[in-house]
Amino acid sequence: GKKNFLHDLRTELKAKTGTEPPFLANDPNIGGRFSMFSPVGMFTAELMGLDSDAMIKAAADVFEDFKAAQSIQESEAAKIAALDILLTQKGLQNRYSMVYADSFEALNKFRAQLKGESLNKTGVASTIQVPGVGTANHHSDLELLFKKDNKLVLEQIYWGKPAQDHVNSKSLDCLDDLVGQSNHQSLIDNHIIALGKYLIDNKAVVIQTIIPEQNEKYLSQ
């Protein structure tokens, strides 16, 4: 098989010290994008404070539901793939993914890689996911999206229930209309929905990907 530097390092350390260093064994049948759910990805997840068992179970549940489905309508994964293929058939080649939480930025780029390694890799005519520039520069996203006939599909990605939120308390009189408002709900009402409606009114296609809750289950699925 392929040379593995870490394997060679472990072997040499054992030979020279008489002690085998601790290691995580990886199933040789797991590679590529599927490595996310092997020790390659899950060790990092644990270091971040995530429950790897919960993430693996959530991903397995999605796969089992897909295998058990008798039709596209019975599988969420199949419906998402079918929609993606349909968009391409309608002449919409690029899906621009705009995230509304910093915690999504790295994940959004990873999703683009997963997309390229699945439908796109097998030659299926499906959209190309273009990760947005991120929350710190949404005005650049808007400059691109507001162009007429840009053939872009806007995907808005946000938490349904973030792990942390803030409800505005009484402060300055000029801010009284914000008292009692959740920052997250304000973001949804005043930016996400408003932008989506504007683009739809201008004949653009908008998809909302709402992750119900900020936890391992929904993050993995």
Protein language model regions, located:
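Active-site phosphate/pyrophosphate-binding segments
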Residues: 2-154
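Residue-level detector of flexible, active-site-proximal loop/helix-junction positions
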Residues: 30, 213-215
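Helicase-primase coupling helices
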Residues: 129-213
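Short, intrinsically disordered, charge-balanced linker/junction segments flanking boundaries
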Residues: 215-221
